[in-house]
């Protein structure tokens, strides 16, 4: 969670002032961070989770299995991934999501936050 917290400090959110940080732990033990990056054309903004996942996918094509993602925002507790991010994380086999609910860390199996999901094995 400390990596996600640190990533939230790098967010670019001049319009909403809603800072989010994410940290991904891969099966290979690597950690990748991301923060939300807003754009004046709001639809072009990218969430912290997708930012971290694209960094992971680019950094090491052999280590693209997500063991867990931690998500943090100083603006909201808990801060869960949005629907688009959940589907994006699903692509890389995310197993667990960790959020800080203000009183401590909460862990959720990925299937609990995206039940009956569609993934690569469905094609």
Tell where the protein language model's regions lie, with residue ranges.
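Short solvent-exposed loop/turn micro-motifs enriched in small/polar/acidic residues
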Residues: 15-17, 92
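Short beta-strand scaffold segments in enzyme catalytic cores
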Residues: 17-26
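Short, basic/aromatic recognition patches
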Residues: 1-13
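Small-residue (primarily alanine) positions within well-ordered alpha-helices
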Residues: 4, 22-23, 52
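Zn2+-dependent cytidine deaminase-like catalytic core
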Residues: 33-122
């Amino acid at each position: 969670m400390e990596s996600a917290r640190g990533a939230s400090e790098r967010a670019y959110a001049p319009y909403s002032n809603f800072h989010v940080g994410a940290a991904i732990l891969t099966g290979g033990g690597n950690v990748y961070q991301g923060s939300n990056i807003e754009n004046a054309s709001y639809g072009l903004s990218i969430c912290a989770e997708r930012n971290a996942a694209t960094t992971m996918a680019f950094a090491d094509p052999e280590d693209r299995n997500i063991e867990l993602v931690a998500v943090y925002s100083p603006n909201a507790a808990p801060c869960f991934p949005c629907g688009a991010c959940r589907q994006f994380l699903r692509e890389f086999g995310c197993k667990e999501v960790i959020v800080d609910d203000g009183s401590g860390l909460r862990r959720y199996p990925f299937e609990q936050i995206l039940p009956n999901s569609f993934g690569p094995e469905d094609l």
